[in-house]
Swiss-Prot record:
GO terms for cellular component: cell surface; Golgi apparatus; plasma membrane. This is Thrombopoietin receptor. It comes from Mus musculus (Mouse). A motif (WSXWS motif) lies at residues 465-469. Residues 178-270, 383-479 form the Fibronectin type-III domain. Glycans are attached at residue 117. Residues 1-25 form the signal peptide. SMART domains: FN3.
Amino acid sequence: MPSWALFMVTSCLLLALPNQAQVTSQDVFLLALGTEPLNCFSQTFEDLTCFWDEEEAAPSGTYQLLYAYRGEKPRACPLYSQSVPTFGTRYVCQFPAQDEVRLFFPLHLWVKNVSLNQTLIQRVLFVDSVGLPAPPRVIKARGGSQPGELQIHWEAPAPEISDFLRHELRYGPTDSSNATAPSVIQLLSTETCCPTLWMPNPVPVLDQPPCVHPTASQPHGPAPFLTVKGGSCLVSGLQAGKSYWLQLRSQPDGVSLRGSWGPWSFPVTVDLPGDAVTIGLQCFTLDLKMVTCQWQQQDRTSSQGFFRHSRTRCCPTDRDPTWEKCEEEEPRPGSQPALVSRCHFKSRNDSVIHILVEVTTAQGAVHSYLGSPFWIHQAVLLPTPSLHWREVSSGRLELEWQHQSSWAAQETCYQLRYTGEGREDWKVLEPSLGARGGTLELRPRARYSLQLRARLNGPTYQGPWSAWSPPARVSTGSETAWITLVTALLLVLSLSALLGLLLLKWQFPAHYRRLRHALWPSLPDLHRVLGQYLRDTAALSPSKATVTDSCEEVEPSLLEILPKSSESTPLPLCPSQPQMDYRGLQPCLRTMPLSVCPPMAETGSCCTTHIANHSYLPLSYWQQP
């Protein structure tokens, strides 16, 4: 039999037998049988169902279930039987609706065999401790305000006890490739769950007050709600752009009411929108009025942007959000298709802005991308700052930048990046918040490119980074610091030495003269040095004995030439001392009695020191004409 046919038959049976509660095998499993022969549970804590199993079927009217509160007369609960293949026959009793089910009072139960007039089972229980809540119904799931968030809404089957229940979520990806992956079970805490209020006159979403929890009636009028209809929870940490299935179940909180976990609800599937970061979504404002959003345009696709405003509240609304179309910027006629799509809209500063982008492929498939919500003062885009620099020393730059938005100067932070010529890696520096300049140390005799950008990051305004400024080309000079230092040091030392010498000359002349003689000695007498040199050379001449022997080798002449008359003109005297012009004269010749010069020709003669005048010459030289 098909599943839909089985569902229709079961529904007809339930409609035909409205007073007969069905005890399913799942209910039996959840009650953890084996501790009590008579099992009872309550789904809304306003009803009660009890059952027990017998191995053999008995005729109708054989068994009877009696119940009574303390001090009251026992009453019989109508029984009906179910065939259980494993245990035989199951007898089930659902308390009549007209009989009030009381909480926090002991309830006495008896199972009797009427034919034998024998009590088979006896039990005392509290209805508030045998809870088995039915699963939530009318479950709605959709993406939250953040990428990867799941917002769940449901209606409680028993509104009166919804505040005393806790819920558990079971979910997993619907992708068939991950079918074997274990499902995730998460206990939904009260911090992420809020009750959904049912109000007689719903107000617009933006005018709804913050989440109101159920309270007693106010003395000045009725409460702004009637009953708690259901709940709402926000689950985060999911993967954006994926499809998930989910189930919910409930359990008493264990404080006011106690019991077991109820059955799981039917699975509900939901498709989460993708993260708009993957398409490069960026929204900004220049005047705090108009908001511009841009994203990357893919090939052979069309896209459209949507926006909505919402108020922050602790409980999300169960209504589907209303998205407004963002006004798209049309490309210029004749221009090539833009790689970036843009749209703009007028915003307010008193609500949160949500952005949704729908991309339609060439095959007609629609993919949704959700951006992170933001306030308009968190998306202020600054113009590109201008960078000025000057080199104060070799490799040391003094930087200054100016910005047009002086009203937000103290909340503006900057990023400076630079790189060497021919390199692709950038070094990024972040000056302190609100800085208007700084210094940068670079390598001398090199070329660099510098760029600057800015953004707001203060307590009042925030925003994205601006575009990088045009590259500033910098050529650093040679490193002359050490030359300047050495020159200055030499000048200081020279001046100090000069001042010291002047002071020494004035105060201590004797010491000054000695110091001057030691530092600047007087030039020697060249004549004295030459004479000393000649004397030293003569001392190193051959010994006297050797010269005497050589003189003895010269034999004297036996002829003496005398003049004719003794009245001849006297010759000038020769100097008694030999001249130093002929240092090569033999020492033996210095003692010879050569006192007059020989007669000269008629033209006259003079005394000469030529060595030929002191030697014996051939006779023909002295003959008269």
